[in-house]
Amino acid sequence: MTPTKQHKKETFTHFIFRVFMILVGAASAAVSIELFLIPNDFIDGGIIGVSLILDHLFMSNPFLNFAFFVVILNIPFMIFGYKYIGKTFLVSTFIGIVGLAVIESSLHHVEAITTQPILATVFGGLLLGFGVGLVIRNGGSMDGTEILGILLTKKLPFSVGEFVMFINVFIFIWAVFVFGPEQAMYSFMTYYIAMKTIDAVIQGLDETKAVIIVSEQYDEISDAILHRLGRGTTKLKGKGGYTDEEKDVIYAVVTRLEVTKLKSIVFEVDQNAFITIMNTHETRGGKFKNAIH
């Protein structure tokens, strides 16, 4: 029986750096929400959007505020994320969401930066997108609807993007009745700007990424991806154009929430590995295994 290989775990220094970057992202999102969105009755999509609407509806109760709702509503999704994506994702997401709630609450008595709708839309969207993107780039998430989308679309004939958009349509329709059509339209513009900013921060919003890895340690890397990320790999035969040497090439498909973890795994095994990460237009067929890192 072949003994199970022991793989390196994330170093404490790298973990602290990730936590710092996640908190920077949470702070950016909190500033956007408290100083741009809430004063102008704007919302975002997903759990943040629902939390903003509920914050407005229960404004007479100081305890039922945005911070309360964004934590409570995300708890079920964090549990699902732990089960299907992994412990690292759970810890990163927990830090991001709690950080967002705490920082947003501490800004309650700070005056709004602007009440000009266009300025609030543009800069609120930019700050929110930057913050959420930074959290995702460092292995976490602030939006449970995307986690739910990743899980449900394994069994439903929809992409994650289609599922999230479907949910957000209902959230913005709800906003029309709560805030009025004009604020809902500004909110949609804010959401669009935020999504484009997230795209720029994490280099791609597709739910899955195709990854090609070239390394002399292809067996160990493939084994690490399987046992730490729970993803299968395909070994391809390649030949160097200059050296004419044959090489084994690893091909894998992962969700965008797993890209950070995959890169960490690869470079822990081989710092000289060559990685290419590509957006996939659509992924159909086959079965993703549950992540077990």
UniProtKB/Swiss-Prot annotation:
Q: Which UniProt keywords apply?
A: Cell membrane, Membrane, Transmembrane, Transmembrane helix
- Which PANTHER family does this entry report, sorted A to Z? UPF0750 MEMBRANE PROTEIN YITT-RELATED, UPF0750 MEMBRANE PROTEIN YQFU
Q: What is the protein name for this chain?
A: UPF0750 membrane protein YqfU
State a GO cellular component annotated for this protein: plasma membrane
User: Where does the record place it?
Assistant: Cell membrane
Q: Which family does it belong to?
A: Belongs to the UPF0750 family.
Origin species, per record, is: Bacillus subtilis (strain 168)
Q: Which Pfam families does this chain map to?
A: DUF2179, YitT_membrane
What is the membrane topology listed in the Swiss-Prot or TrEMBL record?
A: Multi-pass membrane protein
Concerning Gene3D superfamilies, the annotation shows: 3.30.70.120
Q: Does the keyword Transmembrane apply?
A: yes
Q: What is its main location?
A: membrane
The yes or no answer to whether the keyword Magnesium is present is no
Q: Which residues span the membrane?
A: 19-39, 40-60, 62-82, 84-104, 116-136, 160-180
